[in-house]
Every structure is written in structure tokens, then in C-alpha cells.
């Protein structure tokens, strides 16, 4: 999912990719290919920069920790669904967005929905 977000950012005239946070070896290759900094964790990123916004496309079990860290830093988050792997964690994420008065958007794409896919066939 992260790669799809990167492609969308690259096509945008309103956004740019600042950096990547990734612990896997693929992150090294990707950051070199895209010519953007790579960080091994969020703590290092936040010590050096404050992004305008972030996209979190990590394994579900990491959603709470990662999202809350950015929200506490007042950084808006686009979080890929599901919001979390359990209700308690989901509530913590939502409460963090509210208490920090910071935007939280849950990504819910419809790229496999036939109705959405056929919208391009309509000529208005």
C-alpha cells in the first residue's frame, strides 16, 4: 500500500515525498531510487524534521504506536485501514487525534469497486 501512496504523491502537483521510514532492506533501495532520506524509525525522523503530514501504511499491530506518536507532535495522519487490530487501540488513536486537535484520516480506497471503476465511462 505504501508504494501506491508514493506513486500518487509523485503524480501530485500539491504534494511531495519528503522521506521514508522503513526498517526493511527494501527501504534502502527505495530511498535511493526516489532520492529521499530514509529513517529507521519515527523517533529519528521527528528529531530532525516535522513533516506537514504523514501516511502510515505499516502492519496493523503498529498503527497505534506510530499514529499516536505523530498526532502528539501535531502532525496530520492518513492511516491505512483498519484503524487498528483491536477496539481499545482504535479508541486510543481516535482520542489522541481529538486531544491533540490534529487531523486523522482513515484510508479506505474503492479501487476494486466495479461502480467506481466504471465512473470513467460516463461522459457528461
Predicted features, each with a name:
Residues 13-14, 73, 98-102:
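Short helix-capping segments at alpha-helix termini
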Residues 122-124:
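Conserved small/polar residues in nucleotide/adenosyl-binding loops
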Residues 117-118:
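Active-site Tyr-X1-5-Lys
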Residues 15-19, 52-54, 104:
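Short active-site oxyanion
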Residues 92-110:
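Rossmann-fold dehydrogenase core element
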Residues 12-14, 48, 113:
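Acidic-histidine catalytic/liganding microenvironments
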Residues 5, 37-96:
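Beta-loop-alpha module in the N-terminal Rossmann-like domain of NAD(P)-dependent dehydrogenases
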